[in-house]
Amino acid sequence: MTAASSHPLGLTFASFAGLGPEAGFTAAQWAVDAGYRSFWVAETTGLEAFSTLAAIGAARPELDLGTGVLATQLRTPGVTAMGAATLQALHPDRNILLGIGVSSPTVVRRWHGAEYGDRPLARMREELTLLRLCLSGEKVDFAGDFHTVKGFRLGVRLGERRPKIILAALNPLMLRLAGELADGVLLNYLPASHVAWSVEQVRAGGDATVYGYVHVGVTDPEPNRDLGRKDLFSYIVVDAYADNFIRAGFADEVAQVRECHAAGNREAALAAVSDRMVDAIDILGDAHHVHASVQAYVNAGVDVPIVMPMPWGPDRMGVISDTINAAAGRL
């Protein structure tokens, strides 16, 4: 067993959900065959997370099931608890990994017409507290700054195993909050070199398990770096991610991209995403390079690497399959 595969691996559907549900079922089976332990579904405007995981879970009973992540602004804590508890009741012998986080204004306001809200740290602290109360099965009376609940009691009977709450976090205060109140923290869009700093912030709050999305693809980097530029550009223009990229050592790229974007020059903005940045975050190469890259995240402090295959190339499912195997050390 290789060093990387000695850690429990997860697979996220986030980067290829556009290929449809059948691609998820197929990839989940490949993950089972390669020894993966969990399967994760993100949620923006495509597949709904809980129903997708219920179906995947029924077909692939070996896998724990994770939401990675749900926007807290789009569900009440009670509704979120109901969805997670339903998954847990359907799959009582598995871990349900309830990943939540603050989404972007584009997703919340523009795409869904919901209120984005202010005071994200205080709001998330309250969300985590109320969500855990709602999952307890006890009667909940709660009066906070953002939520008031009277008489909620989860109507799903659960055994001793209950959903674990995983908080997606980028900035120091949110990372510390994850360590303090969540069961785990989910890192994303960061190079391996920035993991240790992130883990240090988490540990200032507590002992939460560190999950990390690792963006890798067994494919030729040269013709596909422009896809990486487009991917990273779409996050650089989001303030929270821009700040994190700056902390990770990409201040020049962030400044140039945002300046060009503000001027309406998308072509120049994309060109400002350097090869160095793409190669550090959306990692492409042969199987050995992908395997070593996953190991770098483990060495830096990620407890559970969650492989996000970058399905770039003429045979997208082939890239996904090769990436799943390479990350697991099946070289």
Predicted feature locations:
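Active-site-adjacent structural elements that line small-molecule/cofactor binding pockets in enzymes
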Residues: 1-331
